[in-house]
Amino acid sequence: MAEQPLIGKTILTTRAAGQSSPFAAQLRAAGAAVIEMPTLEIGPPSSWLPLDEAIAAIADFDWLILASANAVEAVQQRLAAQQKSWSDVPCAIAVVGQKTAQVLAAQGGKADYIPPEFIAESLVEHFPQPVAGQRLLFPRVETGGREQITQALQSQGAIVVEVPAYESRCPSQIPDDALIALRQAHLNLISFTSSKTVRNFCQLMASNLGVDWSARISGVAIASIGPQTSITCQELLGRVEVEAQEYTLDGLLLAIEQWARQTT
């Protein structure tokens, strides 16, 4: 039988509705009891028009920047709406992260550039050619996203065209099983995969459990997928006990397993 370092641990995951289950399955395979508390709801932007117009003019761009699987899926949807496929995208494609590249490949596209680290800063730092004067299309979350990619590319002379491709919203309710676990302090660890999951978690806790909600997780370890998420955890939760060294879900799982071995 495979090693199960998470036996006896109860872990709360906070990914988007519909996106948590594969990671939850990995945690369960490692022995954890998992409670899913989605802190994001992914949906369409307020209007498809900017993305549709950009896709119609895709030949005018030198690069397409895809920073998440959500962006890949949105572009795929709007390509199909114009009776197009990834083979109709003449510009080079840059993606953040192997998982994003895998989603792109599954849709029939191919990444021309994947940065060595799975964070936005790495995409800019290791960009394979000078971007001065280049036109870059950047489909992204409509509100609440980070500005680092755009600002860094623009500082190097790139012309970055941002278009809303999807929106991520905070759910209004906490699932009953998660609410019970939080009220009864039946948790060992809470995992976060983005700054937005941290912010929305805090919003949900305040609206559902009152102003003293933080006391309910005072003895619960906080796990972060990477340094930017950790900064937000420190700002809003005051601590981070676990941080992934590789900024992926696999890296987060490994870090949680190492934490469990040290706390057993």
Swiss-Prot record:
Q: Which reaction does it catalyse?
A: hydroxymethylbilane = uroporphyrinogen III + H2O
- GO BP: protoporphyrinogen IX biosynthetic process; uroporphyrinogen III biosynthetic process
Q: Which domain of life is it from?
A: Bacteria
Reported function: Catalyzes cyclization of the linear tetrapyrrole, hydroxymethylbilane, to the macrocyclic uroporphyrinogen III.
Taxonomic lineage is: Bacteria, Bacillati, Cyanobacteriota, Cyanophyceae, Synechococcales
Q: In which pathway does it act?
A: Porphyrin-containing compound metabolism; protoporphyrin-IX biosynthesis; coproporphyrinogen-III from 5-aminolevulinate: step 3/4
The source organism is Synechococcus elongatus (strain ATCC 33912 / PCC 7942 / FACHB-805)
Q: Which family does it belong to?
A: Belongs to the uroporphyrinogen-III synthase family.
Q: What CDD domains is this protein classified in?
A: HemD (cd06578)
Q: Which gene encodes it?
A: hemD
Q: Which UniProt keywords apply?
A: Lyase, Porphyrin biosynthesis
What protein name is recorded for this chain?
A: Uroporphyrinogen-III synthase
Task: Output the Pfam families linked to this UniProt entry.
Answer: HEM4 (PF02602)
